[in-house]
Regions:
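Transmembrane alpha-helical segments of major facilitator superfamily
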Residues: 6-14, 100
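Paired intracellular helix-loop junctions of major facilitator superfamily
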Residues: 29, 80-90, 119
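Interfacial helix-cap and linker-helix signal at transmembrane-aqueous boundaries
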Residues: 24-26, 110-119
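Loop-to-transmembrane helix entry/capping segments in MFS-fold secondary transporters
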Residues: 1, 86-96
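C-terminal transmembrane helical hairpin of 12-TM major facilitator-type secondary transporters
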Residues: 29-79
């Protein structure tokens, strides 16, 4: 029973991150930099967890990482409709889900392999933190959110609804 209560702590943090970061991203009308910041927060949390394995600070690190992981979902999933519409948007979302499912398999496998090699979870957590940093760099350097319908304005969070209404 204690394990269940302890496991709940990072996910409460994640739920708070999901709601609060999504609201912040909508209020700022900004996706890329919110996604980048969430990736950095996740990386910091994973490094803290890796440095403090076996202590309560590891739970704090995992909670920070989960806050960032779940906080990235709102900005991330609002982006595909800004780039594509109709069947192209559906196909891109399906492709993203397929890659995510592969990550759901290979992520735990990778952490387990690193734990077997090093006798510690720290290496696996550092590797996942490195992937979060790579995600942040890709966001900063390569992600350019297009203008909706070439209006010269920055993309709005409700741009997908406008396009759907026009179809």
């Amino acid at each position: 029973m204690t394990v269940g209560w302890l496991t709940m702590i990072p996910y409460i943090s994640g739920g708070l991150g999901l709601v609060s970061w999504g609201m912040l991203s909508d209020r700022m009308n900004e996706r890329r930099w919110n996604l980048l910041a969430a990736c950095v927060v996740s990386a910091i949390g994973l490094v803290i967890a890796g440095l403090t394995i076996g202590t309560w600070w590891a739970m704090v690190g995992l909670s920070i990482a989960t806050f960032g992981f779940y906080g990235s979902k709102g900005p991330f999933w609002s982006m595909p409709p800004m780039f594509m519409t109709g069947t192209a948007a559906a196909a891109s979302i399906a492709w993203i889900n397929s890659i995510g499912n592969l990550g759901g398999f290979f992520g735990p496998w990778y952490v387990g392999v690193i734990k077997d090699w090093t006798d510690s979870y720290a290496g696996g957590l550092y590797g996942l933190a490195f992937l979060c940093v790579i995600s942040a760099v890709v966001c900063a350097l390569f992600l350019d959110i297009p203008n909706p319908a070439g209006t010269g304005q920055k993309a709005r969070p409700d741009a997908a609804a406008d396009v759907a209404a026009a179809d």
